[in-house]
Protein backbone atom coordinates (compact mmCIF):
# COMPACT_ATOMS: atom_id res chain seq x y z
CA UNK A 1 0.00 0.00 0.00
CA UNK A 2 1.32 3.40 -0.94
CA UNK A 3 0.82 6.64 0.99
CA UNK A 4 0.77 9.96 -0.86
CA UNK A 5 -0.28 13.37 0.48
CA UNK A 6 -1.49 11.82 3.78
CA UNK A 7 -3.77 9.31 2.04
CA UNK A 8 -3.56 5.66 1.04
CA UNK A 9 -3.57 5.85 -2.74
CA UNK A 10 -5.83 2.82 -3.22
CA UNK A 11 -8.30 3.47 -0.40
CA UNK A 12 -11.78 4.77 -1.11
CA UNK A 13 -11.96 8.34 0.18
CA UNK A 14 -14.95 9.82 2.00
CA UNK A 15 -13.77 12.99 3.72
CA UNK A 16 -15.28 13.45 7.16
CA UNK A 17 -15.77 16.94 8.60
CA UNK A 18 -14.86 15.51 12.03
CA UNK A 19 -11.16 16.21 12.46
CA UNK A 20 -8.81 18.80 13.88
CA UNK A 21 -5.29 19.98 13.20
CA UNK A 22 -2.49 17.68 14.32
CA UNK A 23 0.10 19.30 16.57
CA UNK A 24 2.12 16.24 17.56
CA UNK A 25 4.06 13.57 15.71
CA UNK A 26 2.29 10.30 14.95
CA UNK A 27 3.72 7.43 16.98
CA UNK A 28 0.74 5.22 17.77
CA UNK A 29 -1.91 3.22 15.91
CA UNK A 30 -5.18 2.43 17.68
CA UNK A 31 -7.43 -0.42 16.52
CA UNK A 32 -11.17 -0.22 17.14
CA UNK A 33 -14.27 -2.16 16.18
CA UNK A 34 -17.61 -0.74 15.14
CA UNK A 35 -20.92 -1.78 13.63
CA UNK A 36 -24.22 0.07 13.57
CA UNK A 37 -26.45 -1.44 14.76
CA UNK A 38 -24.08 -3.74 16.62
CA UNK A 39 -23.48 -6.92 14.63
CA UNK A 40 -25.20 -5.65 11.47
CA UNK A 41 -22.89 -5.10 8.52
CA UNK A 42 -24.90 -4.75 5.33
CA UNK A 43 -25.35 -0.98 5.54
CA UNK A 44 -23.51 2.35 5.38
CA UNK A 45 -24.39 3.51 8.89
CA UNK A 46 -20.78 3.84 10.04
CA UNK A 47 -19.95 5.94 7.01
CA UNK A 48 -23.02 8.08 7.73
CA UNK A 49 -21.98 8.47 11.38
CA UNK A 50 -18.52 9.70 10.38
CA UNK A 51 -20.13 12.14 7.93
CA UNK A 52 -22.71 13.44 10.48
CA UNK A 53 -25.49 12.04 8.27
CA UNK A 54 -26.71 9.10 10.36
CA UNK A 55 -30.50 8.78 10.50
CA UNK A 56 -30.99 8.36 14.24
CA UNK A 57 -34.53 7.06 13.74
CA UNK A 58 -33.32 3.92 11.92
CA UNK A 59 -32.56 2.06 15.15
CA UNK A 60 -33.15 2.64 18.84
CA UNK A 61 -29.45 2.12 19.62
CA UNK A 62 -28.60 5.22 17.56
CA UNK A 63 -30.30 7.61 19.99
CA UNK A 64 -27.20 7.92 22.16
CA UNK A 65 -25.22 9.05 19.10
CA UNK A 66 -27.30 12.17 18.37
CA UNK A 67 -24.73 14.71 19.55
CA UNK A 68 -21.65 12.62 18.86
CA UNK A 69 -19.06 13.80 16.34
CA UNK A 70 -16.56 11.05 15.62
CA UNK A 71 -14.31 9.79 12.85
CA UNK A 72 -11.41 7.49 12.17
CA UNK A 73 -8.60 7.73 9.69
CA UNK A 74 -9.45 4.34 8.22
CA UNK A 75 -12.35 1.90 8.22
CA UNK A 76 -11.92 -1.73 7.16
CA UNK A 77 -15.20 -3.38 6.19
CA UNK A 78 -15.99 -7.10 6.45
CA UNK A 79 -15.05 -7.71 2.80
CA UNK A 80 -11.71 -5.94 3.30
CA UNK A 81 -12.74 -2.67 1.64
CA UNK A 82 -10.67 0.21 3.01
CA UNK A 83 -12.21 3.66 3.38
CA UNK A 84 -10.20 6.68 4.47
CA UNK A 85 -12.12 9.47 6.20
CA UNK A 86 -9.36 11.71 7.55
CA UNK A 87 -5.90 12.40 6.11
CA UNK A 88 -3.07 11.14 8.31
CA UNK A 89 -1.72 14.65 8.89
CA UNK A 90 -4.97 15.58 10.70
CA UNK A 91 -6.44 14.32 14.01
CA UNK A 92 -9.39 11.99 13.61
CA UNK A 93 -11.77 11.87 16.56
CA UNK A 94 -11.58 8.17 17.42
CA UNK A 95 -10.02 7.69 20.84
CA UNK A 96 -12.00 9.97 23.14
CA UNK A 97 -10.75 10.15 26.71
CA UNK A 98 -7.55 8.12 26.51
CA UNK A 99 -4.02 7.70 27.82
CA UNK A 100 -0.96 5.87 26.48
CA UNK A 101 2.41 5.74 28.26
CA UNK A 102 1.38 8.69 30.44
CA UNK A 103 0.26 10.86 27.51
CA UNK A 104 -3.39 11.88 27.39
CA UNK A 105 -5.65 12.50 24.36
CA UNK A 106 -4.33 9.85 22.02
CA UNK A 107 -6.12 11.44 19.05
CA UNK A 108 -3.31 13.99 18.93
CA UNK A 109 -0.55 11.46 18.24
CA UNK A 110 -2.28 8.42 16.78
CA UNK A 111 -3.88 6.97 13.69
CA UNK A 112 -7.29 5.42 14.34
CA UNK A 113 -8.45 2.36 12.42
CA UNK A 114 -12.02 1.12 12.79
CA UNK A 115 -12.63 -2.52 11.88
CA UNK A 116 -16.20 -3.43 11.04
CA UNK A 117 -17.24 -5.92 13.68
CA UNK A 118 -18.03 -6.35 17.34
CA UNK A 119 -16.07 -7.47 20.37
CA UNK A 120 -17.63 -10.93 20.65
CA UNK A 121 -17.45 -11.92 17.00
CA UNK A 122 -14.52 -13.06 14.87
CA UNK A 123 -13.15 -10.80 12.17
CA UNK A 124 -12.80 -11.90 8.53
CA UNK A 125 -9.77 -13.16 6.64
CA UNK A 126 -10.11 -10.20 4.26
CA UNK A 127 -10.00 -7.76 7.15
CA UNK A 128 -6.84 -9.31 8.62
CA UNK A 129 -5.14 -9.41 5.21
CA UNK A 130 -5.78 -5.74 4.47
CA UNK A 131 -5.19 -4.64 8.05
CA UNK A 132 -1.75 -6.26 7.93
CA UNK A 133 -0.95 -4.38 4.71
CA UNK A 134 -2.19 -1.13 6.26
CA UNK A 135 -0.17 -1.58 9.43
CA UNK A 136 2.99 -2.57 7.57
CA UNK A 137 2.76 0.55 5.39
CA UNK A 138 1.94 2.92 8.28
CA UNK A 139 4.70 1.54 10.51
CA UNK A 140 7.30 2.08 7.81
CA UNK A 141 6.04 5.45 6.59
CA UNK A 142 5.62 7.01 10.04
CA UNK A 143 8.21 4.86 11.89
CA UNK A 144 5.59 3.64 14.38
CA UNK A 145 6.31 0.83 16.83
CA UNK A 146 3.14 0.80 18.93
CA UNK A 147 -0.16 -0.70 17.77
CA UNK A 148 -2.76 -1.02 20.52
CA UNK A 149 -6.40 -1.85 21.11
CA UNK A 150 -8.83 0.93 22.00
CA UNK A 151 -9.38 -1.01 25.22
CA UNK A 152 -5.70 -0.46 26.12
CA UNK A 153 -5.89 3.33 26.01
CA UNK A 154 -9.42 3.62 27.46
CA UNK A 155 -9.73 0.53 29.68
CA UNK A 156 -12.53 1.92 31.85
CA UNK A 157 -14.70 2.75 28.83
CA UNK A 158 -13.88 0.46 25.92
CA UNK A 159 -13.51 -3.25 25.10
CA UNK A 160 -12.73 -3.13 21.38
CA UNK A 161 -11.57 -4.70 19.21
CA UNK A 162 -12.26 -7.47 21.73
CA UNK A 163 -10.97 -10.86 22.89
CA UNK A 164 -11.67 -12.55 19.55
CA UNK A 165 -9.36 -10.19 17.68
CA UNK A 166 -6.42 -12.40 16.66
CA UNK A 167 -3.30 -10.25 16.97
CA UNK A 168 -1.13 -13.13 15.72
CA UNK A 169 -2.69 -12.79 12.25
CA UNK A 170 -1.04 -9.38 11.94
CA UNK A 171 2.39 -11.00 12.36
CA UNK A 172 1.92 -13.69 9.70
CA UNK A 173 3.99 -13.45 6.51
Description of each model-found segment:
Residues 75, 112-114:
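Conserved beta-strand segments that form the floor/walls of ligand-binding pockets within enzyme
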Amino acid sequence: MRISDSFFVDAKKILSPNFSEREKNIDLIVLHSISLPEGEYDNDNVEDLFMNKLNFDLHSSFQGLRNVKVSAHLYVKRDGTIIQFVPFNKCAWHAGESIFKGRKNCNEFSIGIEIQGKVDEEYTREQYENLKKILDALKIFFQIDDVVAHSEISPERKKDPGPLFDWSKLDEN
